[in-house]
Amino acid sequence: MSSDTEMEVFGIAAPFLRKSEKERIEAQNQPFDAKTYCFVVDSKEEYVKGKIKSSQDGKVTVETEDSRTLVVKPEDVYAMNPPKFDKIEDMAMLTHLNEPAVLYNLKDRYTSWMIYTYSGLFCVTVNPYKWLPVYNPEVVDGYRGKKRQEAPPHIFSISDNAYQFMLTDRENQSILITGESGAGKTVNTKRVIQYFATIAATGDLAKKKDSKMKGTLEDQIISANPLLEAFGNAKTVRNDNSSRFGKFIRIHFGTTGKLASADIETYLLEKSRVTFQLKAERSYHIFYQILSNKKPELIELLLITTNPYDYPFISQGEILVASIDDAEELLATDSAIDILGFTPEEKSGLYKLTGAVMHYGNMKFKQKQREEQAEPDGTEVADKTAYLMGLNSSDLLKALCFPRVKVGNEYVTKGQTVDQVHHAVNALSKSVYEKLFLWMVTRINQQLDTKLPRQHFIGVLDIAGFEIFEYNSLEQLCINFTNEKLQQFFNHHMFVLEQEEYKKEGIEWTFIDFGMDLAACIELIEKPMGIFSILEEECMFPKATDTSFKNKLYDQHLGKSNNFQKPKVVKGKAEAHFSLVHYAGTVDYSVSGWLEKNKDPLNETVVGLYQKSSNRLLAHLYATFATTDADGGKKKVAKKKGSSFQTVSALFRENLNKLMSNLRTTHPHFVRCIIPNETKTPGAMEHSLVLHQLRCNGVLEGIRICRKGFPNRILYGDFKQRYRVLNASAIPEGQFIDSKKACEKLLASIDIDHTQYKFGHTKVFFKAGLLGTLEEMRDERLAKLITRTQAVCRGFLMRVEFQKMMQRRESIFCIQYNIRAFMNVKHWPWMKLFFKIKPLLKSAETEKEMATMKEEFQKTKDELAKSEAKRKELEEKLVTLVQEKNDLQLQVQAESENLLDAEERCDQLIKAKFQLEAKIKEVTERAEDEEEINAELTAKKRKLEDECSELKKDIDDLELTLAKVEKEKHATENKVKNLTEELAGLDETIAKLTREKKALQEAHQQTLDDLQAEEDKVNSLSKLKSKLEQQVDDLESSLEQEKKLRVDLERNKRKLEGDLKLAQESILDLENDKQQLDERLKKKDFEYSQLQSKVEDEQTLSLQLQKKIKELQARIEELEEEIEAERATRAKTEKQRSDYARELEELSERLEEAGGVTSTQIELNKKREAEFLKLRRDLEEATLQHEATVATLRKKHADSAAELAEQIDNLQRVKQKLEKEKSEFKLEIDDLSSSVESVSKSKANLEKICRTLEDQLSEARGKNEEMQRSLSELTTQKSRLQTEAGELSRQLEEKESIVSQLSRSKQAFTQQIEELKRQLEEENKAKNALAHALQSSRHDCDLLREQYEEEQEGKAELQRALSKANSEVAQWRTKYETDAIQRTEELEEAKKKLAQRLQDSEEQVEAVNAKCASLEKTKQRLQGEVEDLMVDVERANSLAAALDKKQRNFDKVLAEWKTKCEESQAELEAALKESRSLSTELFKLKNAYEEALDQLETVKRENKNLEQEIADLTEQIAENGKSIHELEKSRKQMELEKADIQMALEEAEAALEHEEAKILRIQLELTQVKSEIDRKIAEKDEEIEQLKRNYQRTVETMQGALDAEVRSRNEAIRLKKKMEGDLNEIEIQLSHANRQAAETIKHLRSVQGQLKDTQLHLDDALRGQEDLKEQLAIVERRANLLQAEVEELRATLEQTERARKLAEQELLDSNERVQLLHTQNTSLIHTKKKLETDLTQLQSEVEDACRDARNAEEKAKKAITDAAMMAEELKKEQDTSAHLERMKKNLEQTVKDLQHRLDEAEQLALKGGKKQIQKLETRIRELEFELEGEQKRNTESVKGLRKYERRVKELTYQSEEDRKNVLRLQDLVDKLQVKVKSYKRQAEEADEQANAHLTKFRKAQHELEEAEERADIAESQVNKLRAKTRDFTSSRMVVHESEE
């Protein structure tokens, strides 16, 4: 996700392309609950957002955003993605992929005006219905060169990706923009073209042609669109600018990616719109643009008004469109015409014909009086139309009303009715407009064809979208059928081809059927007996009607095809005749007028006028139209065979098939356009409409396959070349390694997710997004490498600069040292004296030197003048020599050119041979096609003959029925006469009979009409029959011509015999296949043994599982027994509770009997009773809960037992299947053994053939190798001789120049001797020069002799090699003489045939067709001969096929095993889930039990309070000492009972704990069983994978062997052909070499003769010199004078000689230095390589260290995550401990409250006791005072005392019971405290574990720091080593420079 700064590139378009960073952060911070937030199905909006409130009983309650509450099924609720995925750019990245998620993502982006969204591999765009600033130039620049993931979704991104793919993959691309009508396809097409015209612009304005208005190629491509839209777009119900034609725009690019040219193909222009529009539509834009009066000159030119309602053709619907400005559009259209280079005449004709179409609609006709014929109703409109079309108006009206029709061989004028004339006018208008449109497209293509070299193209497809109107006709069917085919192409490319590619490349893939096959609807329309076929068939019959067409459709398809339905009748809607179920919906079609539309008839008389029109454009449009009244022999030329049957539907299907074939040859990119609503409202989205389009277009399926599959793939070689930079060390240098292995090593060494790619046979496949990651890694790596390289270069440059600075520094030091030394001695006296004397010492010498210098100057001046004269002469000689040299070079060049021409001719002959062979193949293929066509024609002929016979039978039947009718007529007439005579009064019967007569007459007339129609039909069929018979005659004549060429084909028979040899070689291939099959059989035996062992393992595993199940069942029984014991204890405790309750009731009754209880005691008793009732209720609830838990536990145990039983059954079934497979494998092994026996028998037969063929192959290879060696020797000798010849020629030229120079110099010397005797010394000098030249010439002669001898030796060697080659050639010729002769003859004949073809192409085609037919016959005859030889081959192939079939069956078995394993694993996972749910329920039970314990504690506290109160009461009655002993006994008894109850309670708790332990043991055993099963499954998966790999390897080896044999066979054939060609070339080269050798020998002889001549001249010169010596005495004085000059010249000569020697010495020194530098360079290169290896080692060590550091970082991260997890666990434990602490505090608070209540009760009891004691004391005193006197009162007091005693006993008993309860509760409190302590201890242990993890984390962090330190140390070492290497290299450089 790019930042806001990166989005600034797009300018104002940025908010419309991608969310800002602020929005992204806000989305991430939004509150979101994944469990409650959801999408839910809604009846109105399809899907709405909501929150889950509750879920129970299979229903989910959801509250929607608009506060509605919905109760739906769980499957109607869909998960919602987190807010960070809102407005995601690629919907393939969504976490939850479902329909509502995709819908709301598109909706959210659409509301933010982000109309482009990626959907996996393609792009989805939603029509915004308004202008958005997302197509500006800065947006184009922003997308240029960007990868898909680097920029937001856009049509420009798709375009740029297609452009980049074209450049990198060198493959044609296509962009398919599809969608329903009004979805925005045309706009996106324009933007694509705009983008290509911008980024690939040539920028060469100089390419503009003559017209000033014409623009560049980019301008013309862009301008083509407005012109096409003006003439081809119109307003429809759904779209204001709907394309009413389809176009495929191909933009061609050159090798550099620049625009080269473009062309446009159009499909299916909707012609009917010219004359008819619906109410809410209008015609084509151009009519309304012209009428906008923006260009008034057009109104005058076309003779029209500005009111559209004046023209019925264009005013049937709407006139104005709010979103289109017709006036501005007219200017754009006119400008586009100019830019596209239309001439003024063409432009005028374009407008005129458009205006004429409008005028056609105003032409009126009326019916003649008393006739049905039509006549013109006024001629004004016809005059205008004729003027615009360049016609005569009267001729036009006559042709319309009275056209000429051909009847037989004569032409008849036929009268037309008014309706017929109107139909003709409409047809002509549509035809003119259509042809005008097609001409315009052709003219645009001519202009866009720049003839520049072009390599690849990108095609942009824009067709009319899917349409469902109220009235749908043939045009809508064609449009919808085209969209159906394109959708099928998309489905096939996205879902079928993609998965087939995975299978073909050997990638593990389970085929997914997305259910997107549209073949049923397509076949219904285009297959034989489909809709188009029936339509074309009906068009052939003259009396066919739309009704008969409809009836045929119903008979053929209604009820037989699900896609063909009868339409429902809807009131107010146009009548429909049938319905088709398309991919985008069901469409009702009306067949009205389909036959006429399909036949498309024209008034041929008017067309003839068009062809003679003065309007050149109109005449050009109809120049190729064939009419029946064409002149003379033009008929055959103008009209091809069968063109009369070319219907609109047939032409449409042909164009559509061509388009689909074009698309299949390109790499497609899909853009899906979506309509958001039907009202064209910006920003509004109808959910149902958008969902319908998404489902039809396969958007969700495309995303799914993009996520599951591997959408990106690269060839291994390309991947290695492009991404090797990521880790170059992974691929070793200097040794060959397979590209696949290299890619595997490379990817394994990169830090990526290794599950995101797969290796195929030829390509590596990537998941979506991984290739982008690799590209980013590559960019980063390249950036690092470039910066590293820059750093090294800059460092090197700075070091060089530093060395220069050091040299300058040393020089400065030297200068400074000398200057300082001079400054020190400057003022020394002796030095001053030296400065003064030194000039004086040299003054005398200088004078002498000056005099000598003057003399020398004069001498040198004279010598200079002489040398200048000599130099001029030598320059003249040099010019002549250069001219001679150039002449020789021209001769040599001419010879070399001749040689090259000969070689080129040889190459051309070879190429011509190959071309002829290819043409022969093409001809044979075409012959096969012609034979197929011939067979089809004969079948059609037979069919037509059958139909003719049937028609004749029908005619005979009709004649018989006619005769019968005549007889019946006569009979009825006689009856009528008799009845009138006999029954004159019966008028009613007479009337009845007359009515019957009339009916019979009508039937008779009808039969006569039918008979006439059948006769017409028979006539047409007879014409067709005659035509077909003519074709048959032509074919028979061509067959006779083929028989003549049969002699040529007999020669090809020998070629086929050579193919027999190839077939024998294929037998060798089959031998190898047999060996491989043997190996596969062995492998299958081994695999069978492995499977047996696996079956045994499975049996043992099933036995173990059965044992475990039995053990588990025993444990379950034990648990049930324990539960029964628990119930018994519960019953016992319940019984005790009831006893206690009964005793308590008795005590209460006794207390009620006691009368003296105080009010406080009564209140306490009530309070105790209420508390007791509360305790009873709590206890009952606890028992109920306990029983519920026991029931659930029992149920879960039963479920687990049932699951285990099911697992046993599954294992039993698996066992049975394994046994079945075992038996099947045994049968397969038997079959394989039988096949092996048959193969072994065939092997014995094939071995003999194999041996013979191997011997022949080895001989051929040996000879081939010898030939190649000899050829290589000859080529080397040839090259050496050529170089030697060139050297000799150069030396000869030099010698000739020297000789000529010597001769000229000799003549000059003789003249000088005769004329000027004083130049004797110069002659001596010339003599010396001649002597030197003589020596050099002799040396050169020696060299020439040596070279000549070497050349003679080379010639001898060459002759020997030539003789050897000739002998080998003779051998080859004897061996292949017949083949060579045959080939030469074939070549000569092919040349003749080629010349004949070039002269007459039509004759060539016929000859080739005939030849192909005879070829096919001979081929069939020879194939019959070959079949006998191929019996063994077919047998072996059948065996291989059987083995392959068995292998496929085995693969199926393996797949079934895998599915079974997956099912068992799923069942195991379900069992594990159930066990987890059991454990959670057990945990809930524990919580419930703890809550019950809490309630028991509260009850215990209350009992304790009661016990305290009872204790107070006992203290009150303690004064009565008599009952203390009894109370003590009862107390002991109560304690015993309390102990029993306590023991029972402890036993219950122990039983519960025992149950918990057992459950834990069961869970552990379940986990063990799960792990065991997982291990077994993993082992099985590994074994299955091993089997798959073994089979894959065997298949690969077999395929590789087969490919190798095929390659070797092809290589042998190629070598054979190459050797034959090389032999011819060698012969030609030998002849050239012989000629050159003869020429060089002649040249040498001439040179030797010249050398002899020069020798004679030299002898003469010596003799002349001797004569001159005799004359020396005479010229002695002259010699003395000239002696000084000679000496001076000699000195200068010596000086020049010394300079020459010095230069030579310097040259030698420089060569030595070069050698030294070369050696130093090589040593430096070696050291550099060594250092580079060291550096790579160091880099690898650094990378290892970095890897270790990364591993340490990962460990640290892992430790951090572990610490975080432990911290979370600690937090949880702390929370639980805090909860327990809170519970503890609550318990303590309740204890305090109870203690407080107990104190209060004690105080109350004490107060009441004191009062009673005081009363008793007063009573005792009263009794003591009145003891004697009142006996009665004494007895009463004794009774009262006894009552009190009973009451005390009861109270003491109750107090003991309460005390026991209190003690029991106290024990429970103690246990709870123990548990609290244990929880505290667990919390402390958790703290300790957290501390331990923290220490581990600190330790890991410490290790990480140490690893980082080690990495830093390693990096510093690397830097040191680098510094050392730099120092070493710099020192070597310094040493090297010092040596220099």
Swiss-Prot record:
Gene Ontology BP term (one): skeletal muscle contraction
Ranges for domain Myosin N-terminal SH3-like: 33-82
MF-aspect GO terms: actin filament binding; ATP binding; ATP hydrolysis activity; calmodulin binding; microfilament motor activity
InterPro entries membership: IQ_motif_EF-hand-BS, Kinesin_motor_dom_sf, Myosin_head_motor_dom-like, Myosin_N, Myosin_S1_N, Myosin_tail, MYSc_Myh3, P-loop_NTPase
Record carries keyword Heme: no
Alphabetical UniProt keywords: Actin-binding, ATP-binding, Calmodulin-binding, Coiled coil, Cytoplasm, Methylation, Motor protein, Muscle protein, Myosin, Nucleotide-binding, Thick filament
Sections of the chain in a coiled coil: 841-1928
Residue ranges of every copy of the Myosin motor domain listed in the record: 86-779
Polar residues bias spans: 1269-1282
Chain residue ranges for the region called Actin-binding: 656-678, 758-772
IQ domain location: 782-811
PTM sites of type N6,N6,N6-trimethyllysine: K130
Free-text note on domains in this protein's UniProt record: The rodlike tail sequence is highly repetitive, showing cycles of a 28-residue repeat pattern composed of 4 heptapeptides, characteristic for alpha-helical coiled coils. Limited proteolysis of myosin heavy chain produces 1 light meromyosin (LMM) and 1 heavy meromyosin (HMM). HMM can be further cleaved into 2 globular subfragments (S1) and 1 rod-shaped subfragment (S2).
Family: Belongs to the TRAFAC class myosin-kinesin ATPase superfamily. Myosin family.
Protein name: Myosin-3
The organism's taxonomic lineage, starting at the top: Eukaryota, Metazoa, Chordata, Craniata, Vertebrata
Gene name per UniProt: Myh3
